[in-house]
A protein has these predicted regions:
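N-terminal secretory signal peptides and thylakoid transit peptides that target proteins
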Residues: 1-19
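C-terminal segment of classical bacterial N-terminal signal peptides
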Residues: 24-31
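Short, surface-exposed beta-strand/loop patches at domain edges
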Residues: 31-32, 208
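N-terminal [4Fe-4S]-dependent radical SAM core
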Residues: 42-69, 74-131, 146
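Extended interfacial segments that mediate partner engagement and assembly in macromolecular machines
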Residues: 99-180, 185, 191
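Conserved AdoMet/S-adenosylmethionine-binding subsite of the radical SAM
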Residues: 159-249
């Protein structure tokens, strides 16, 4: 039996047993094998704000008085200095906007691709699936609310840059990487960089999203993605307003 087959059997055994190397937010657990391979593993203490994975954000414009306007989603948050947007993962620092979750996923799994769900994209294969904290909606029925509505300080995360994500997918024979579980729109910079690294390694990157995004970042994402699944929550504006605190656009 090859080393790759042994690694795969170890991983499947860990998944079947419900083994968890670290509990990362709301019961979403990384299997022991993946947790070990992720490198440094989860940082178990709640980090200080200065320790977060701050990277320059894209898709914003500067306003007067050190304020910025985010152009990532239709909320168009206007954010004062040292404040954050509604998603909680993007922060204004002296008139410069930053994402606080780049290369810091809080959930990491090897899932059947049908779980995303994608039924006509490489059926029968596995997808390395990851998420950071954060979302730009507040759905009352969200099954992953513990991480979707959390702030970066509240949930431990892995130090996992895009090239390591691609390497892990390759190691476990996953032909795809899925940005899922929370809302990849609010960590779009990381998702794009993961997709670029994945493409260089011959992998496709998938996005599972609520679709609440502006045109420019949408175009930037689509340019590097292999497939997108949009979760339409309902068909009425009232439902989006009352149950998701957002808009159907």
């Amino acid at each position: 039996m090859s080393g790759a087959d042994l690694e795969r059997r170890r991983l499947l055994a860990a998944l079947a047993a419900g083994s968890a190397g670290a509990c990362l937010g709301g019961g979403l657990s990384a299997p022991a094998v993946l947790a070990q391979d992720a490198g440094t593993g989860p940082s178990l203490g709640a980090p200080l704000a200065d320790d977060l994975a701050a990277r320059p954000a894209r898709w914003y414009r500067k306003l007067e008085g050190l304020r910025v306007e985010c152009g990532l989603c239709p909320r168009r948050c206007r954010v004062a200095d040292l404040e954050r947007g509604a998603c909680g993962v993007r922060e204004n620092r002296a008139g410069e906007y930053f994402t606080l979750v780049h290369s810091r996923p809080c959930s990491l799994h090897l899932d059947p691709i049908e779980k995303k769900p994608f039924y006509h994209v490489l059926p029968g294969t596995s997808s390395l699936s990851l998420a950071t904290v954060g979302c730009n909606l507040e759905c009352r029925f969200c099954q992953n609310w513990e991480i979707a509505q959390a702030r970066p300080e509240q949930v431990p995360g892995f130090d996992l840059p895009p090239d390591r994500v691609a390497a892990l997918a390759g190691k476990y024979g996953a032909p795809t990487i899925a940005c899922t579980y929370t809302e990849p729109v609010v960590w779009a910079e990381y998702a794009i960089d993961v997709a670029v690294a994945g493409r260089a390694a011959g992998l496709r990157t998938l996005l599972v999203s609520n679709g609440y995004i502006e045109r420019e970042p949408l175009d930037d994402l689509i340019a590097v993605l292999g497939a997108v699944k949009v979760d339409l929550k309902a068909f009425t504006d009232g439902f989006y307003r009352d149950q998701c605190r957002g808009e159907r656009k």
